[in-house]
Amino acid sequence: MAEVRNYTFNFGPQHPAAHGVLRLIVEVDGEVIQRIDPHIGLLHRATEKLAESKPYNQTIGYMDRLDYVSMMANEHGYVLAIEKLLGIEPPIRAKYIRTMFDEITRILNHLLWLGAHALDVGAMTVFLYCFREREDLMDCYEAVSGARMHATYYRPGGVYRDLPDSMPKYKPSRWHNEKAVKKMNEAREGSLLDFIWDFTARFPNLIDEYESLLTDNRIWKQRTVGIGVVSAERALQLGFTGPMLRASGVEWDLRKKQPYAAYDRVDFDIPIGREGDCYDRYLVRIEEMRQSNRIIRQCVEWLRKNPGPVIIDDYKIVPPQREVMKRDMEALIHHFKLFTEGYIVPEGEAYAAVEQPKGEFGVYIVSDGANKPYRVKVRAASYPHLAAMNEMCRGHMIADLVAIISSIDIVFGEIDR
Protein backbone atom coordinates (compact mmCIF):
# COMPACT_ATOMS: atom_id res chain seq x y z
CA MET A 1 0.00 0.00 0.00
CA ALA A 2 1.38 3.41 -1.00
CA GLU A 3 2.39 5.68 1.86
CA VAL A 4 0.52 8.98 2.27
CA ARG A 5 3.08 11.78 2.31
CA ASN A 6 2.95 15.39 3.44
CA TYR A 7 3.91 18.02 0.89
CA THR A 8 4.40 21.77 0.92
CA PHE A 9 4.00 23.48 -2.44
CA ASN A 10 3.46 26.91 -3.98
CA PHE A 11 0.14 27.81 -5.59
CA GLY A 12 0.81 30.82 -7.84
CA PRO A 13 1.74 33.58 -8.30
CA GLN A 14 1.76 32.47 -11.96
CA HIS A 15 -1.40 30.39 -11.98
CA PRO A 16 -4.55 30.90 -14.09
CA ALA A 17 -6.81 30.44 -11.04
CA ALA A 18 -4.80 32.76 -8.77
CA HIS A 19 -6.86 35.83 -9.82
CA GLY A 20 -3.83 38.06 -10.09
CA VAL A 21 -0.53 37.55 -8.34
CA LEU A 22 -1.76 35.45 -5.43
CA ARG A 23 0.87 33.19 -3.88
CA LEU A 24 -0.26 30.52 -1.44
CA ILE A 25 2.08 28.20 0.45
CA VAL A 26 -0.03 25.06 0.80
CA GLU A 27 0.67 22.18 3.17
CA VAL A 28 -1.17 18.98 2.23
CA ASP A 29 -1.54 15.54 3.77
CA GLY A 30 -2.04 13.40 0.67
CA GLU A 31 -4.64 15.52 -1.14
CA VAL A 32 -6.18 17.11 1.95
CA ILE A 33 -5.18 20.70 2.80
CA GLN A 34 -3.70 21.08 6.29
CA ARG A 35 -2.59 24.71 6.18
CA ILE A 36 -2.50 27.67 3.79
CA ASP A 37 -0.29 30.73 4.13
CA PRO A 38 -1.19 33.58 1.70
CA HIS A 39 1.71 35.78 0.60
CA ILE A 40 0.79 39.25 -0.62
CA GLY A 41 2.68 42.30 -1.86
CA LEU A 42 3.61 41.28 -5.39
CA LEU A 43 1.39 44.02 -6.85
CA HIS A 44 2.25 46.72 -4.30
CA ARG A 45 2.42 50.13 -6.02
CA ALA A 46 2.43 52.46 -2.98
CA THR A 47 -0.90 54.03 -3.90
CA GLU A 48 -1.46 55.48 -0.42
CA LYS A 49 2.00 57.06 -0.42
CA LEU A 50 1.54 58.40 -3.96
CA ALA A 51 -1.67 60.12 -2.83
CA GLU A 52 0.34 62.15 -0.30
CA SER A 53 2.39 63.76 -3.07
CA LYS A 54 -0.50 64.67 -5.40
CA PRO A 55 -3.25 67.28 -5.13
CA TYR A 56 -6.59 65.80 -4.09
CA ASN A 57 -8.11 65.96 -7.57
CA GLN A 58 -5.20 64.05 -9.15
CA THR A 59 -5.63 61.00 -6.90
CA ILE A 60 -9.12 60.11 -8.17
CA GLY A 61 -7.52 58.21 -11.06
CA TYR A 62 -5.49 56.07 -8.65
CA MET A 63 -8.71 54.84 -7.03
CA ASP A 64 -9.84 53.30 -10.34
CA ARG A 65 -6.67 51.24 -10.39
CA LEU A 66 -7.06 49.70 -6.94
CA ASP A 67 -9.88 47.23 -7.54
CA TYR A 68 -9.76 47.61 -11.31
CA VAL A 69 -13.08 45.76 -11.75
CA SER A 70 -15.06 48.11 -9.45
CA MET A 71 -13.73 51.38 -10.79
CA MET A 72 -16.40 54.02 -10.10
CA ALA A 73 -17.31 52.47 -6.74
CA ASN A 74 -13.72 53.11 -5.58
CA GLU A 75 -13.88 56.71 -6.80
CA HIS A 76 -17.10 57.17 -4.86
CA GLY A 77 -15.49 56.32 -1.52
CA TYR A 78 -12.63 58.74 -2.13
CA VAL A 79 -14.76 61.71 -3.25
CA LEU A 80 -17.19 61.16 -0.35
CA ALA A 81 -14.30 61.52 2.11
CA ILE A 82 -13.16 64.76 0.41
CA GLU A 83 -16.75 66.08 0.43
CA LYS A 84 -16.94 65.43 4.18
CA LEU A 85 -13.76 67.45 4.75
CA LEU A 86 -14.92 70.27 2.46
CA GLY A 87 -18.44 70.26 3.92
CA ILE A 88 -20.10 70.18 0.50
CA GLU A 89 -23.10 68.27 -0.87
CA PRO A 90 -23.46 67.28 -4.55
CA PRO A 91 -26.68 68.13 -6.44
CA ILE A 92 -29.44 65.51 -6.28
CA ARG A 93 -29.05 64.68 -9.99
CA ALA A 94 -25.37 63.89 -9.40
CA LYS A 95 -26.38 61.60 -6.51
CA TYR A 96 -28.70 59.64 -8.79
CA ILE A 97 -26.04 59.40 -11.51
CA ARG A 98 -23.54 58.11 -8.93
CA THR A 99 -26.07 55.57 -7.64
CA MET A 100 -26.80 54.37 -11.17
CA PHE A 101 -23.13 53.97 -12.07
CA ASP A 102 -22.33 52.30 -8.74
CA GLU A 103 -24.89 49.64 -9.65
CA ILE A 104 -23.63 49.37 -13.24
CA THR A 105 -20.20 48.81 -11.68
CA ARG A 106 -21.65 46.15 -9.36
CA ILE A 107 -23.07 44.24 -12.34
CA LEU A 108 -19.77 44.64 -14.23
CA ASN A 109 -17.90 43.21 -11.26
CA HIS A 110 -20.30 40.33 -10.64
CA LEU A 111 -20.34 39.36 -14.32
CA LEU A 112 -16.55 39.07 -14.36
CA TRP A 113 -16.63 37.19 -11.06
CA LEU A 114 -19.31 34.77 -12.28
CA GLY A 115 -17.55 34.08 -15.58
CA ALA A 116 -14.17 33.54 -13.91
CA HIS A 117 -15.65 31.47 -11.06
CA ALA A 118 -17.45 29.18 -13.50
CA LEU A 119 -14.33 28.89 -15.67
CA ASP A 120 -12.21 27.95 -12.64
CA VAL A 121 -14.64 25.20 -11.73
CA GLY A 122 -14.82 23.98 -15.34
CA ALA A 123 -17.86 25.66 -16.96
CA MET A 124 -16.79 27.69 -19.98
CA THR A 125 -20.11 28.76 -21.53
CA VAL A 126 -21.04 31.14 -18.71
CA PHE A 127 -17.73 32.97 -19.10
CA LEU A 128 -18.55 33.79 -22.74
CA TYR A 129 -22.11 34.85 -21.89
CA CYS A 130 -20.96 37.19 -19.10
CA PHE A 131 -18.45 38.98 -21.30
CA ARG A 132 -21.16 39.55 -23.91
CA GLU A 133 -23.11 41.64 -21.36
CA ARG A 134 -20.01 43.36 -19.97
CA GLU A 135 -19.39 44.90 -23.40
CA ASP A 136 -22.68 46.81 -23.23
CA LEU A 137 -21.94 48.15 -19.74
CA MET A 138 -18.42 49.18 -20.70
CA ASP A 139 -19.99 51.18 -23.52
CA CYS A 140 -21.86 53.12 -20.79
CA TYR A 141 -18.54 53.88 -19.11
CA GLU A 142 -17.10 54.99 -22.43
CA ALA A 143 -20.10 57.22 -23.18
CA VAL A 144 -19.67 59.32 -20.02
CA SER A 145 -15.89 59.32 -19.61
CA GLY A 146 -14.23 58.24 -22.85
CA ALA A 147 -12.61 55.25 -21.09
CA ARG A 148 -13.90 51.70 -20.86
CA MET A 149 -12.39 51.00 -17.45
CA HIS A 150 -10.55 53.78 -15.61
CA ALA A 151 -13.23 56.43 -15.91
CA THR A 152 -12.19 59.12 -13.37
CA TYR A 153 -15.79 60.32 -13.69
CA TYR A 154 -16.69 61.25 -10.10
CA ARG A 155 -15.59 64.60 -8.69
CA PRO A 156 -15.88 66.17 -5.24
CA GLY A 157 -19.17 68.02 -5.58
CA GLY A 158 -20.72 65.87 -8.31
CA VAL A 159 -19.68 64.19 -11.54
CA TYR A 160 -17.50 65.32 -14.45
CA ARG A 161 -20.33 65.85 -16.96
CA ASP A 162 -24.02 65.18 -17.54
CA LEU A 163 -25.21 62.06 -19.32
CA PRO A 164 -24.77 62.25 -23.12
CA ASP A 165 -27.69 62.43 -25.57
CA SER A 166 -26.11 59.93 -27.95
CA MET A 167 -24.24 56.64 -27.77
CA PRO A 168 -21.05 55.65 -29.62
CA LYS A 169 -21.89 53.30 -32.50
CA TYR A 170 -20.09 50.34 -34.01
CA LYS A 171 -18.80 50.45 -37.58
CA PRO A 172 -18.39 47.54 -40.02
CA SER A 173 -15.00 45.85 -39.66
CA ARG A 174 -13.18 42.59 -40.30
CA TRP A 175 -15.00 41.09 -37.32
CA HIS A 176 -18.51 42.53 -37.81
CA ASN A 177 -20.26 42.84 -41.17
CA GLU A 178 -22.93 45.46 -41.91
CA LYS A 179 -25.80 43.18 -40.87
CA ALA A 180 -24.19 42.42 -37.49
CA VAL A 181 -23.33 46.09 -36.91
CA LYS A 182 -26.90 47.15 -37.69
CA LYS A 183 -28.21 44.74 -35.05
CA MET A 184 -25.61 45.90 -32.51
CA ASN A 185 -26.49 49.56 -33.09
CA GLU A 186 -30.27 49.14 -32.73
CA ALA A 187 -30.21 50.04 -29.03
CA ARG A 188 -27.65 52.82 -29.61
CA GLU A 189 -29.89 55.12 -31.64
CA GLY A 190 -31.08 57.13 -28.63
CA SER A 191 -29.45 58.60 -25.53
CA LEU A 192 -27.37 56.84 -22.89
CA LEU A 193 -30.45 56.55 -20.67
CA ASP A 194 -32.36 54.89 -23.54
CA PHE A 195 -29.50 52.42 -23.98
CA ILE A 196 -29.38 51.60 -20.26
CA TRP A 197 -33.18 51.20 -20.18
CA ASP A 198 -32.99 48.73 -23.07
CA PHE A 199 -30.20 46.79 -21.32
CA THR A 200 -32.08 46.58 -18.02
CA ALA A 201 -35.17 45.28 -19.85
CA ARG A 202 -33.11 42.41 -21.33
CA PHE A 203 -30.84 41.65 -18.40
CA PRO A 204 -33.20 39.63 -16.10
CA ASN A 205 -33.70 37.06 -18.88
CA LEU A 206 -29.93 36.87 -19.34
CA ILE A 207 -29.47 36.18 -15.61
CA ASP A 208 -32.02 33.38 -16.03
CA GLU A 209 -29.73 31.97 -18.74
CA TYR A 210 -26.78 31.90 -16.34
CA GLU A 211 -28.90 30.24 -13.67
CA SER A 212 -30.24 27.62 -16.09
CA LEU A 213 -26.63 26.60 -16.74
CA LEU A 214 -25.43 26.57 -13.12
CA THR A 215 -27.94 26.80 -10.27
CA ASP A 216 -29.33 23.24 -10.47
CA ASN A 217 -26.35 21.78 -12.28
CA ARG A 218 -25.28 18.61 -10.45
CA ILE A 219 -21.54 19.12 -11.04
CA TRP A 220 -21.70 22.81 -10.06
CA LYS A 221 -23.43 21.95 -6.78
CA GLN A 222 -20.96 19.15 -6.02
CA ARG A 223 -18.10 21.64 -6.44
CA THR A 224 -19.66 24.46 -4.36
CA VAL A 225 -22.19 23.16 -1.79
CA GLY A 226 -20.60 22.74 1.65
CA ILE A 227 -17.23 24.08 0.44
CA GLY A 228 -15.47 26.90 2.32
CA VAL A 229 -18.15 27.29 4.99
CA VAL A 230 -17.94 30.32 7.32
CA SER A 231 -20.58 30.79 10.03
CA ALA A 232 -22.27 34.16 10.62
CA GLU A 233 -20.51 34.64 13.98
CA ARG A 234 -17.10 33.77 12.56
CA ALA A 235 -17.63 35.97 9.49
CA LEU A 236 -18.20 38.97 11.77
CA GLN A 237 -15.12 38.11 13.84
CA LEU A 238 -12.99 37.88 10.68
CA GLY A 239 -14.14 41.29 9.41
CA PHE A 240 -16.08 40.01 6.40
CA THR A 241 -18.25 42.49 4.49
CA GLY A 242 -20.29 42.49 1.30
CA PRO A 243 -21.52 39.26 -0.34
CA MET A 244 -19.10 37.19 1.78
CA LEU A 245 -20.81 38.37 4.99
CA ARG A 246 -24.33 38.26 3.59
CA ALA A 247 -23.82 34.70 2.30
CA SER A 248 -23.16 33.68 5.92
CA GLY A 249 -26.58 35.02 6.91
CA VAL A 250 -25.79 38.52 8.21
CA GLU A 251 -28.01 41.24 6.74
CA TRP A 252 -25.47 44.06 6.53
CA ASP A 253 -25.33 46.42 3.58
CA LEU A 254 -24.06 50.01 3.81
CA ARG A 255 -26.55 51.09 1.14
CA LYS A 256 -29.34 50.31 3.66
CA LYS A 257 -27.63 50.73 7.04
CA GLN A 258 -25.65 53.92 6.28
CA PRO A 259 -27.24 55.29 3.08
CA TYR A 260 -25.21 57.57 0.82
CA ALA A 261 -25.83 59.09 -2.64
CA ALA A 262 -29.49 58.35 -3.55
CA TYR A 263 -29.79 54.91 -1.94
CA ASP A 264 -32.33 56.16 0.59
CA ARG A 265 -34.57 57.16 -2.34
CA VAL A 266 -34.60 53.85 -4.23
CA ASP A 267 -36.26 50.55 -3.37
CA PHE A 268 -34.29 47.29 -3.27
CA ASP A 269 -33.80 44.16 -1.17
CA ILE A 270 -30.69 42.68 0.47
CA PRO A 271 -30.19 39.01 -0.44
CA ILE A 272 -28.70 36.85 2.32
CA GLY A 273 -27.60 33.21 2.46
CA ARG A 274 -27.87 30.54 5.15
CA GLU A 275 -24.91 28.19 4.94
CA GLY A 276 -22.00 30.56 4.20
CA ASP A 277 -20.53 28.22 1.57
CA CYS A 278 -19.39 28.82 -2.02
CA TYR A 279 -22.87 28.02 -3.35
CA ASP A 280 -24.53 30.64 -1.13
CA ARG A 281 -21.97 33.24 -2.24
CA TYR A 282 -22.93 32.44 -5.83
CA LEU A 283 -26.68 32.75 -5.11
CA VAL A 284 -26.23 36.04 -3.21
CA ARG A 285 -24.29 37.65 -6.06
CA ILE A 286 -26.79 36.42 -8.66
CA GLU A 287 -29.63 38.03 -6.70
CA GLU A 288 -27.53 41.19 -6.19
CA MET A 289 -27.36 41.57 -9.98
CA ARG A 290 -31.17 41.43 -10.13
CA GLN A 291 -31.46 44.05 -7.37
CA SER A 292 -28.85 46.28 -9.08
CA ASN A 293 -30.89 46.05 -12.28
CA ARG A 294 -33.94 47.16 -10.29
CA ILE A 295 -32.08 50.15 -8.80
CA ILE A 296 -30.74 51.22 -12.22
CA ARG A 297 -34.26 51.27 -13.71
CA GLN A 298 -35.49 53.50 -10.86
CA CYS A 299 -32.54 55.86 -11.42
CA VAL A 300 -33.18 56.03 -15.18
CA GLU A 301 -36.86 56.89 -14.58
CA TRP A 302 -35.92 59.67 -12.15
CA LEU A 303 -33.12 61.10 -14.32
CA ARG A 304 -35.41 61.32 -17.35
CA LYS A 305 -37.92 63.44 -15.42
CA ASN A 306 -35.50 65.64 -13.47
CA PRO A 307 -32.87 67.64 -15.40
CA GLY A 308 -30.51 69.85 -13.45
CA PRO A 309 -26.90 70.55 -12.47
CA VAL A 310 -24.56 67.59 -11.96
CA ILE A 311 -21.83 69.40 -10.01
CA ILE A 312 -21.73 72.29 -7.54
CA ASP A 313 -21.12 75.83 -8.78
CA ASP A 314 -18.00 76.73 -6.80
CA TYR A 315 -14.94 77.79 -8.80
CA LYS A 316 -12.66 77.20 -5.82
CA ILE A 317 -13.33 73.45 -6.09
CA VAL A 318 -14.80 72.85 -9.55
CA PRO A 319 -13.17 74.31 -12.69
CA PRO A 320 -15.31 76.79 -14.63
CA GLN A 321 -16.75 75.75 -17.98
CA ARG A 322 -14.48 76.29 -20.96
CA GLU A 323 -16.65 78.98 -22.60
CA VAL A 324 -16.79 80.94 -19.30
CA MET A 325 -13.05 80.55 -18.74
CA LYS A 326 -12.30 81.95 -22.23
CA ARG A 327 -14.09 85.24 -21.62
CA ASP A 328 -13.86 85.87 -17.86
CA MET A 329 -10.51 86.78 -16.26
CA GLU A 330 -11.51 85.63 -12.77
CA ALA A 331 -12.69 82.27 -14.12
CA LEU A 332 -9.37 81.90 -15.96
CA ILE A 333 -7.45 82.48 -12.70
CA HIS A 334 -9.57 79.86 -10.89
CA HIS A 335 -9.01 77.43 -13.76
CA PHE A 336 -5.24 77.99 -13.69
CA LYS A 337 -4.98 77.58 -9.92
CA LEU A 338 -7.13 74.42 -9.88
CA PHE A 339 -5.03 72.71 -12.52
CA THR A 340 -1.68 73.73 -11.05
CA GLU A 341 -2.04 73.47 -7.27
CA GLY A 342 -5.60 72.12 -6.82
CA TYR A 343 -7.90 73.18 -3.99
CA ILE A 344 -7.16 73.61 -0.29
CA VAL A 345 -8.93 71.19 2.04
CA PRO A 346 -9.51 72.35 5.65
CA GLU A 347 -7.53 70.66 8.43
CA GLY A 348 -9.24 67.57 9.82
CA GLU A 349 -9.90 63.91 9.17
CA ALA A 350 -12.74 61.95 7.56
CA TYR A 351 -13.66 58.35 6.85
CA ALA A 352 -16.11 57.44 4.10
CA ALA A 353 -17.21 53.93 3.17
CA VAL A 354 -19.25 52.63 0.26
CA GLU A 355 -20.81 49.23 -0.44
CA GLN A 356 -18.44 48.27 -3.21
CA PRO A 357 -19.22 45.01 -5.13
CA LYS A 358 -16.73 43.06 -2.98
CA GLY A 359 -17.67 44.60 0.37
CA GLU A 360 -16.95 47.73 2.40
CA PHE A 361 -14.46 49.95 0.59
CA GLY A 362 -13.36 52.69 2.97
CA VAL A 363 -11.12 55.74 2.56
CA TYR A 364 -9.68 57.56 5.58
CA ILE A 365 -8.12 60.95 4.82
CA VAL A 366 -6.14 63.17 7.19
CA SER A 367 -5.76 66.76 6.01
CA ASP A 368 -3.25 69.26 7.41
CA GLY A 369 -4.86 72.18 5.60
CA ALA A 370 -2.81 71.86 2.41
CA ASN A 371 -3.67 71.01 -1.19
CA LYS A 372 -2.44 67.42 -0.69
CA PRO A 373 -3.59 64.87 1.90
CA TYR A 374 -1.31 64.30 4.88
CA ARG A 375 -2.36 60.64 4.96
CA VAL A 376 -4.69 58.42 2.93
CA LYS A 377 -5.64 54.98 4.24
CA VAL A 378 -7.64 52.61 2.06
CA ARG A 379 -9.68 49.77 3.56
CA ALA A 380 -9.71 47.09 0.88
CA ALA A 381 -12.86 44.95 0.93
CA SER A 382 -11.10 41.71 -0.09
CA TYR A 383 -8.23 41.92 2.41
CA PRO A 384 -9.99 40.22 5.37
CA HIS A 385 -11.49 37.62 3.01
CA LEU A 386 -8.06 36.56 1.77
CA ALA A 387 -6.76 36.49 5.36
CA ALA A 388 -9.37 33.81 6.14
CA MET A 389 -8.17 31.46 3.38
CA ASN A 390 -6.49 29.10 5.86
CA GLU A 391 -9.67 28.73 7.88
CA MET A 392 -11.91 28.22 4.84
CA CYS A 393 -9.67 25.68 3.09
CA ARG A 394 -8.47 23.50 5.98
CA GLY A 395 -9.74 19.94 5.58
CA HIS A 396 -10.77 20.38 1.94
CA MET A 397 -9.24 18.76 -1.14
CA ILE A 398 -6.73 20.60 -3.36
CA ALA A 399 -9.37 20.88 -6.10
CA ASP A 400 -11.67 22.76 -3.69
CA LEU A 401 -8.98 25.41 -3.15
CA VAL A 402 -9.68 26.87 -6.60
CA ALA A 403 -13.43 27.00 -5.97
CA ILE A 404 -12.89 28.80 -2.65
CA ILE A 405 -10.46 31.36 -4.11
CA SER A 406 -12.83 32.25 -6.93
CA SER A 407 -15.86 32.44 -4.59
CA ILE A 408 -14.08 35.14 -2.55
CA ASP A 409 -13.76 37.45 -5.59
CA ILE A 410 -10.31 38.90 -4.95
CA VAL A 411 -8.49 41.51 -7.01
CA PHE A 412 -4.91 42.18 -6.01
CA GLY A 413 -4.91 45.79 -7.08
CA GLU A 414 -6.78 46.69 -3.88
CA ILE A 415 -5.23 44.06 -1.59
CA ASP A 416 -1.62 45.04 -2.33
CA ARG A 417 -2.39 48.71 -3.10
UniProtKB/Swiss-Prot annotation:
Report which superkingdom the organism of origin falls in: Bacteria
Q: What does this protein do?
A: NDH-1 shuttles electrons from NADH, via FMN and iron-sulfur (Fe-S) centers, to quinones in the respiratory chain. The immediate electron acceptor for the enzyme in this species is believed to be ubiquinone. Couples the redox reaction to proton translocation (for every two electrons transferred, four hydrogen ions are translocated across the cytoplasmic membrane), and thus conserves the redox energy in a proton gradient.
Q: What is stated as this protein's family in its record?
A: Belongs to the complex I 49 kDa subunit family.
Q: What is this protein called?
A: NADH-quinone oxidoreductase subunit D
Catalyses: a quinone + NADH + 5 H(+)(in) = a quinol + NAD(+) + 4 H(+)(out)
InterPro entries per UniProt: NADH_Q_OxRdtase_suD, NADH_UbQ_OxRdtase_49kDa_CS, NDH1_su_D/H, NiFe-Hase_large
Q: How the protein sits in the membrane? A: Peripheral membrane protein
| Localization (cell) | Cell inner membrane
Which Gene Ontology cellular component annotation is one that this UniProt entry carries?
A: plasma membrane
According to the record's subunit comment, the protein's assembly and interactions are: NDH-1 is composed of 14 different subunits. Subunits NuoB, C, D, E, F, and G constitute the peripheral sector of the complex.
For this protein, the record's SUPFAM superfamilies field holds: HydB/Nqo4-like (SSF56762)
Coiled coil spans: none
| UniProt EC number | 7.1.1.-
One GO MF term: NADH:ubiquinone reductase (non-electrogenic) activity
Q: Where are the transmembrane segments?
A: none
Query: Does the keyword Membrane belong to this entry?
Result: yes
What coarse category fits the chief subcellular location reported for this protein?
A: membrane
- Keywords in UniProt for this one? Cell inner membrane, Cell membrane, Membrane, NAD, Quinone, Translocase, Transport, Ubiquinone
